[in-house]
Amino acid sequence: MSEKTVERGRRKVRIGYVVSDKMNKTIVVELEDRVKHPLYGKIIRTTSKVKAHDENEIAGVGDRVQLMETRPLSATKRWRLVEVLEKAK
């Protein structure tokens, strides 16, 4: 018998900064997106905050982290921590 492997969709990967780590195994990360205004051409910075799963609780406030999209882990968590890219100073 041969096992069939199901191809999964590509997961989104984002880089952002931790703004809160007060919850158990959860961090709040601020993601920044830069969009060019369609008419005037000015680059506009928009930010969004997402909750991410941090199983080992290694990330702290101010850390630069990499997140990956995952299945819904709770009512508001849809991201998980991949790695801490840079610790806060």
From Swiss-Prot:
The keyword rRNA-binding applies. Pfam families: Ribosomal_S17. InterPro entries: NA-bd_OB-fold, Ribosomal_uS17, Ribosomal_uS17_bact/chlr, Ribosomal_uS17_CS. The keyword Flavoprotein does not apply. Keywords: Ribonucleoprotein, Ribosomal protein, RNA-binding, rRNA-binding. One of its GO terms (molecular function) is rRNA binding. One of its GO terms (cellular component) is cytosolic small ribosomal subunit. Disulfide bonds: none annotated. Gene3D superfamilies: Nucleic acid-binding proteins. One of its GO terms (biological process) is translation. One of the primary rRNA binding proteins, it binds specifically to the 5'-end of 16S ribosomal RNA. Belongs to the universal ribosomal protein uS17 family. Part of the 30S ribosomal subunit. This is Small ribosomal subunit protein uS17. The lineage of its organism: Bacteria, Bacillati, Actinomycetota, Actinomycetes, Mycobacteriales.
